[in-house]
Amino acid sequence: MSLMEIPSGRDVPNEVNVIIEIPMHGEPVKYEVDKKTGALFVDRFMTTAMFYPTNYGYIPNTLSEDGDPVDVLVITPVPLISGAVISCRAVGMLKMTDESGVDAKILAVPTTKLSKMYQSMQTYQDIPQHLLLSIEHFFKHYKDLEEGKWVKVEGWVGPDAAREEITSSINRYNHIKK
């Protein structure tokens, strides 16, 4: 099965599929799945000596305001491989803008079926504060050395806002697809 055939999830927006592009703590390489072919491409080598604090991917069949699928940060006990699909639920969203416009990041945990470790985490406020600060720090600085690029981190919002973003992005995708 092609990555292009993966649905957004079983119980959207409560449970979504996330296709992992970048494993947590991986090398400073920005990978992106080509949405037409499903192939994993090197997007760029990051110029800052930083690593992603969580797994990083996207929800298929979505379109965020920046023209890309909705970005998702997935908290797991170990790094996931690029191209893996994981069933998640949103616990919050980091509101951000960058040189391309609105660039929110959904914060998600694996569904209870995959791991009971995260069932008590219902909102971003249940996530260890140090991890939230690490995520914010990463996104505030990961483009620092890239000319013409910038990021403004605007803060965390809860799971309701994250689910609204997921629903809006699916509607946007379906509207464009027609």
From Swiss-Prot:
InterPro entries, per database record: Pyrophosphatase (IPR008162), Pyrophosphatase_sf (IPR036649)
One term under GO cellular component: cytoplasm
Cofactor: Mg(2+)
Top enzyme class: hydrolase
One protein family per Pfam: Pyrophosphatase
Residues at which substrate binds: K30, R44, Y56, Y142
Record has Cytoplasm as a keyword: yes
SUPFAM superfamilies reported in the protein's UniProt record: Inorganic pyrophosphatase (SSF50324)
Domain of life: Bacteria
Biological process terms in GO annotation: phosphate-containing compound metabolic process
Binding site for Mg(2+) 1: D66, D71, D103
Keywords assigned by UniProt, alphabetized: Cytoplasm, Hydrolase, Magnesium, Metal-binding
Catalytic activity reported: diphosphate + H2O = 2 phosphate + H(+)
Binding-site list for Mg(2+) 2: D71
Subcellular location: Cytoplasm
GO MF, one example: inorganic diphosphate phosphatase activity
Entry EC number(s): 3.6.1.1
Subunit composition and interactions: Homohexamer.
Function of the protein: Catalyzes the hydrolysis of inorganic pyrophosphate (PPi) forming two phosphate ions.
Similarity field: Belongs to the PPase family.
Stated name of the protein: Inorganic pyrophosphatase
The encoding gene: ppa
